[in-house]
Every structure is written in structure tokens, then in C-alpha cells.
Swiss-Prot record:
EC number: 4.2.1.19
Main location class: cytoplasm
Similarity remark: Belongs to the imidazoleglycerol-phosphate dehydratase family.
Protein name (record): Imidazoleglycerol-phosphate dehydratase
Classification lineage: Archaea, Methanobacteriati, Methanobacteriota, Archaeoglobi, Archaeoglobales
Pathway named in the protein's UniProt entry: Amino-acid biosynthesis; L-histidine biosynthesis; L-histidine from 5-phospho-alpha-D-ribose 1-diphosphate: step 6/9
Species of the source: Archaeoglobus fulgidus (strain ATCC 49558 / DSM 4304 / JCM 9628 / NBRC 100126 / VC-16)
Pfam families: IGPD
Localisation: Cytoplasm
Length: 178
């Protein structure tokens, strides 16, 4: 079980990995995306958050979730994962490296729907930087909800593959992963 708490003047967030699936951020679409991430990654996720502005909650949940994921022991993990996820009119393709180097590269646009594109991309980027995930994500489609959900599912499935235990060594020529 990994836990990370973050309390600032703007937000209060607690993320626990390895417990029951329970998410309450006060932002319905963010809750939906976090539950989707949990279900498709196989990571039991408990998130409780409150804050002054949606943007601050979205950002700080991503920071806390990223820090919790960064605490996972990478020894023996597969490290890499990928997925192609179609969803109605949308499709998302993800390649992921749990390298300790947090980089997000996105090809395509999401548009504004239940969550503004800017906030969605900021969530993904902040998550990647804090977790140490290198994520390449390509998305196509016309419905912003479907594109965002397909993207989260693709990241989740890729993460599930990367977190698969396969031996006792680090998957790195350096012999270590940050």
C-alpha cells in the first residue's frame, strides 16, 4: 500500500494505492477518469480531495497520485506498456515507460467537454512528471469525452503492463530505475 497526502492553502488531497476503489474529488468528471484509471490499470485507488478551485484540485490530485506511483518499487517490473483503445468515434494509442523520467508527449487534441482540454492535459502532464512516467499518447475522434476516456484507458492499460512483475532485476542497462 502506497499513500501520499498533500495539504496546501488551496487543497487537501489524500491518495492511497492498494485499498478499495473509492474516489471523491468533488469534480464528477475527474472522479470518472480516476475510477476508469483504477479499473483498467488494476490499481486499487482511494482518492479524497477538496479545494478552492477545480484547477487546483485537478493539479494536486495529479501530484499526489504521481508521488504515490513514484514510490512503487520498480525492481522486477516489466517497465514498458502500450495499448490501443477504441471508444465509439475515438481511438487512443499509448506507449508508456515507467523510467523515472516524467515526460508527456501528446499528438491530437481533446477539445473542451466536461473538463477543459487545458485542465485534462495539465492533469496528465503533472501525473507523468510526478510519477516518473514517460508517456506518448495519440488521440483521434470527434467527441471530447470519448477521446479523454479512451486516453485514460490507454494509459491505464499501458501502466498495468508496465507494473507487471517479471523477474528480480531492473529493466535498465544502468541497473537501476529512478
Amino acid at each position: 500500500m502506497k499513500k501520499f497526502s498533500r495539504k496546501t492553502e488551496e487543497t487537501e488531497v489524500e491518495v492511497v494505492l492498494g485499498e478499495e476503489l473509492k474516489v471523491d474529488t468533488g469534480i464528477a468528471f475527474l472522479d470518472h477518469m480516476l475510477k476508469t484509471l483504477s479499473r483498467h490499470s488494476g490499481i486499487k485507488l482511494r482518492v479524497k480531495a477538496k479545494g478552492d478551485l477545480e484547477h487546483h484540485v485537478i493539479e494536486d490530485v495529479a501530484i499526489a497520485l504521481g508521488k504515490a506511483l513514484a514510490g512503487v518499487d520498480k525492481k522486477g517490473l516489466e517497465r514498458f506498456g502500450d495499448a490501443i483503445v477504441p471508444m465509439d468515434d475515438a481511438v487512443a494509442i499509448c506507449g508508456l515507460d515507467f523510467s523515472g523520467r516524467g515526460v508527456l508527449v501528446v499528438e491530437g487534441t481533446f477539445g473542451d467537454g466536461e473538463m477543459r482540454e487545458e485542465d485534462f492535459l495539465h492533469f496528465l502532464d503533472t501525473l507523468c512528471r510526478n510519477a516518473g512516467l514517460n508517456v506518448y499518447l495519440s488521440v483521434k475522434g470527434s467527441n471530447s469525452h470519448h477521446k479523454m476516456e479512451a486516453a485514460v484507458k490507454a494509459v491505464a492499460i499501458s501502466l498495468k503492463k508496465a507494473l507487471t512483475k517479471n523477474g528480480n532485476d531492473y529493466r535498465s542497462a544502468k541497473g537501476v530505475l529512478d
